[in-house]
Amino acid sequence: MFKILLVCALAALVAANENAEVKELVNEVNPDGFKTVVSLSDGSASQASGDVHGNIDGVFEWVSPEGVHVRVAYKADENGYQPSSDLLPVAPPIPEAILKSLAWIEAHPSKE
């Protein structure tokens, strides 16, 4: 299922800009995993590699309409999809009062 999603994402990347030319296209499928690379003349690119256990590491990037270079690296494994990028939002730190409450709850477990 994930391979179908990956192929669709690559097709969408290629179709995103009709004027962009494919600079590099690699699709290797081996008994121990796969590797795919797509690079377009407009700066868009996608790379992914996976193993027989379903673990996938990859990166995709493009230049936004504002001229900002966007790059997202990801890992997909038994823990799910884990993207990382400077442009992704980051949760605020947990307030000190909540941390103290959690510590108190841990130190005083329910009697049930």
UniProtKB/Swiss-Prot annotation:
Gene Ontology cellular-component terms listed: chitin-based extracellular matrix
GO molecular function: structural constituent of chitin-based larval cuticle
Cross-referenced Pfam families: Chitin_bind_4 (PF00379)
InterPro entries reported in the protein's UniProt record: CHIT_BIND_RR_consensus, Cuticle_Struct_Prot, Insect_cuticle
Signal peptide boundaries: 1-16
Domain Chitin-binding type R&R: 31-92
Keyword line: Cuticle, Signal
PANTHER family registered for this protein in UniProt: CUTICLE PROTEIN (PTHR10380), CUTICULAR PROTEIN 65AU, ISOFORM A-RELATED (PTHR10380:SF237)
Role this protein plays: Component of the larval cuticle.
Protein name in the entry: Larval cuticle protein III/IV
Organism: Drosophila miranda (Fruit fly)
Gene symbol of the encoding locus: Lcp3
